[in-house]
From Swiss-Prot:
It catalyses: 6-hydroxymethyl-7,8-dihydropterin + ATP = (7,8-dihydropterin-6-yl)methyl diphosphate + AMP + H(+). This is 2-amino-4-hydroxy-6-hydroxymethyldihydropteridine pyrophosphokinase. PANTHER family: 2-AMINO-4-HYDROXY-6-HYDROXYMETHYLDIHYDROPTERIDINE PYROPHOSPHOKINASE. Signal peptide: none annotated. Belongs to the HPPK family. The gene is folK. It comes from Aquifex aeolicus (strain VF5).
């Protein structure tokens, strides 16, 4: 079983409802071990939109990275994600942040996530649940990357 870290976010409609539905669907093919606190953050990229609720989860999977990506895209669609524009509003967004300590660079899948160490809504929730995680490209602890922390705790840990 591979250890995977996913970043989830929502900034449209009933954000908590979308998040809970996504977790429920992910549990059909992942063994979720830890979930970070849910944080509220400003949108990244295209900033003229609602704030996101973001968190990170740690899970075990028997799926290969590309299989996992396909299942995640299916979950996003089933939960209600509508395709808009790059960095636009999202009912649910699920990113593969890390898959074991692998480095994957294909047209459809980039692991670790290309902006992992730059986005506070990835770094701080991930460090909350895995304080000693190593960035597989730089081979340095993620805690050495300190993007400006603009996160506001939104609510408690949802469930494990």
């Amino acid at each position: 079983m591979a250890t995977v870290y996913l970043g989830l976010g929502s900034n449209v409609g009933d954000r908590i409802s979308y998040i809970l539905k996504a977790i429920e669907k992910l549990e059909e093919f992942l063994e979720i071990e830890k979930i970070s606190t849910v944080y509220e953050s400003k949108a990244w990229g295209f900033e003229n939109q609602g704030n996101f609720l973001n968190f990170v989860l740690k899970a075990k999977t028997s799926l290969l990275p590309q299989e996992l990506l396909l299942k995640i895209k299916k979950v996003e669609k089933e939960v209600g994600r509508k395709e808009r524009f790059k960095w636009g509003p999202r009912e649910i967004d699920i990113d593969i942040l890390l898959y074991k300590d692998e480095v994957i660079r294909t047209k459809l899948l980039k692991v670790p996530h290309p902006f992992l160490e730059k986005r506070d809504f990835f770094v701080y929730p991930l460090l909350e649940i895995e304080p000693n995680v190593i960035h597989p490209i730089y081979r340095k602890p993620l805690k050495e990357f300190k993007p400006e922390n603009t996160l506001k705790p939104f609510c408690c840990i949802l469930k494990v």
